[in-house]
């Protein structure tokens, strides 16, 4: 996070900074929330939502803070002004948040606002007053001295220092219900069960969850082990570590024949590859060659529009954000509109839900229709494809690579020697050397 913040403040390639006027006070080196989001999008090539989430994490960790509504540590993609926190208050510096410092901070706020603290700050103030009562005169003296020194600064500097201190204590002493990033970390959510009210409704929900858990069907260990054995026996021949590679392992022999025979769009697939199509419908769709042969089968059965619709939905789901409206309109005109050339057959409820979502198109608007068509092909077309002559012919015509030299476990292979070991050489027999008169004549 610190590297990101330092890059943001780069004078050449960082975020554009400007002076921000708050009423009659001018705050220098301020940045707009919109500029922060745009910089993160361009820097890391991410979506706007992801950039907004990353910026919010930076704010929650105290690396940036808002000049307006300073208690709200979230990033807004608008003209809301923000400033970068000084490195002295960064969480990585591990500056200990001592109780004495927190008491001085609360005492300053109490003097400035004449006792108008937030509820949880009042509780902390009273608790600290009891805990360090022996040094409370020192706390008040330090608070008044810091306020006296602050009056010598410009109003803009006083506002900046006040926001910096408030952001630091919001991170180190968060309000009740807010995420404590120093304990939970950025990967956890803002859910904090310690602040939940243990009411009767809470216990009713707990009892209902336990009842559902008791009524849930449990799978026996014998059934699980049987499923594991079936899966292992089915996938064992296809595991290159356990069964080796045919014709050879390219990482050992430097022979790329294995990669060439298993290319994504090879003309003649191997037998192991064709056999994997029968494992599951997802295996068939994930293989470009298998999907092409499945499309040929569906064309013969006059239902190729189902697979075409599924492919169009996949393109919409993983395509660019700028092309979403165009792709949604194209899919609707081709597959869903009344009298469409490749109209698909889905139930009325799914059609109503899909048409309602098309009013505000997004990349997941066709998920319900895509799932319906997927299950239709999985339960109807896929079993008939495995029993068809097309699949049987592919199995018969599939390529079976010839084994050159296979090492299922390369780490068990013995090292090669340039010359045989002397211990393995047999001593020459004397009769064989002297029995031939021709040999004697030759010498």
Curated annotation (Swiss-Prot):
Protein's UniProt keywords contain Chaperone: no
Segments for region (Disordered): 418-443
SUPFAM superfamilies: Regulator of G-protein signaling, RGS (SSF48097), Transducin (heterotrimeric G protein), gamma chain (SSF48670), Winged helix' DNA-binding domain (SSF46785)
Keywords assigned by UniProt, alphabetized: Signal transduction inhibitor
Domain spans labelled DEP: 11-86
Top-level lineage group: Eukaryota
Gene3D superfamilies: 1.10.1240.60, Regulator of G-protein Signalling 4, domain 2, Transducin (heterotrimeric G protein), gamma chain, Winged helix-like DNA-binding domain superfamily/Winged helix DNA-binding domain
Pfam families per the UniProt record, alphabetical: DEP, G-gamma, RGS, RGS_DHEX
CDD domains (alphabetical): DEP_RGS7-like, GGL
Single biological process term from Gene Ontology: G protein-coupled receptor signaling pathway
Compositionally biased tracts (Polar residues): 418-437
Residue intervals of the RGS domain: 280-395
Xref: InterPro entries: DEP_dom (IPR000591), G-protein_gamma-like_dom (IPR015898), GGL_sf (IPR036284), RGS (IPR016137), RGS6/7/9/11 (IPR047016), RGS6/7/9/11_DHEX_sf (IPR047017), RGS_DHEX (IPR040759), RGS_sf (IPR036305)
Oligomer status and interactors: Heterodimer with Gbeta5. Interacts with RGS7BP, leading to regulate the subcellular location of the heterodimer formed with Gbeta5.
Function field: Inhibits signal transduction by increasing the GTPase activity of G protein alpha subunits thereby driving them into their inactive GDP-bound form.
PANTHER family registered for this protein in UniProt: LP21163P (PTHR45746), REGULATOR OF G-PROTEIN SIGNALING 11 (PTHR45746:SF3)
Protein name: Regulator of G-protein signaling 11
Source organism (scientific name): Mus musculus
């Amino acid at each position: 996070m610190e590297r990101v913040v330092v890059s943001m403040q780069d004078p050449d390639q960082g975020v554009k900074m400007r002076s921000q006027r708050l009423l009659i006070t001018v705050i220098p080196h301020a940045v707009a929330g919109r500029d922060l989001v745009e910089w993160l999008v361009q820097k890391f090539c991410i979506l706007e939502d992801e950039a907004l989430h990353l910026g919010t994490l930076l704010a929650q960790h105290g690396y940036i803070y808002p000049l307006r509504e300073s208690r709200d540590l979230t990033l807004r993609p608008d003209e809301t002004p923000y400033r970068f926190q000084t490195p002295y208050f960064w969480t990585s510096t591990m500056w200990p948040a001592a109780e004495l410092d927190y008491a001085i901070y609360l005492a300053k706020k109490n003097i400035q606002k004449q006792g108008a603290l937030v509820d949880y700050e009042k509780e902390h103030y009273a608790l600290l007053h009891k805990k360090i009562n022996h040094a409370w005169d020192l706390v008040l003296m330090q608070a008044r001295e810091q306020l006296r020194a602050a009056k010598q600064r410009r109003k803009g500097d006083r506002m900046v220092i006040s926001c910096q201190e408030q952001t630091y204590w919001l991170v180190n002493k968060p309000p009740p219900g807010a995420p404590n990033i120093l304990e939970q970390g950025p990967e956890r959510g803002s859910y904090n069960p310690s602040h939940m009210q243990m009411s009767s409704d809470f216990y009713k929900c707990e009892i209902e969850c336990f009842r559902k858990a008791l009524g849930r069907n449990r799978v026996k260990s014998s059934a699980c082990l049987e499923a594991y054995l079936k899966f292992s026996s089915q996938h064992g021949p296809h595991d290159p570590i356990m069964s080796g590679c045919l014709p050879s392992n390219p990482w050992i022999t430097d022979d790329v024949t294995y990669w060439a025979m298993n290319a994504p769009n090879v003309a003649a697939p191997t037998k192991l590859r064709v056999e994997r199509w029968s494992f599951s419908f997802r295996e068939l769709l994930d293989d470009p060659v298998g999907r092409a042969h499945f499309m040929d089968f569906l064309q013969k059965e006059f239902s190729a529009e189902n697979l075409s619709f599924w492919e169009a939905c996949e393109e919409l789901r993983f395509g660019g954000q700028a092309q979403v409206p165009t792709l949604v309109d194209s899919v609707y005109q081709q597959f869903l509109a009344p009298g469409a050339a490749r109209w698909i057959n889905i139930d009325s409820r799914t059609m109503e839900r899909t048409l309602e979502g098309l009013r505000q198109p997004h990349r997941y608007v066709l998920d319900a229709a895509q799932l319906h068509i997927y299950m239709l092909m999985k339960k109807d077309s896929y079993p008939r494809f495995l029993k068809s002559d097309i699949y049987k012919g592919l199995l018969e015509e599939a390529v079976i690579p010839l084994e050159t030299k296979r090492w299922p476990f390369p780490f068990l292979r013995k090292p090669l020697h340039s010359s045989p070991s002397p211990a393995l050489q047999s001593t020459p027999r004397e009769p064989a050397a002297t029995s031939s008169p021709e040999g004697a004549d030759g010498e």
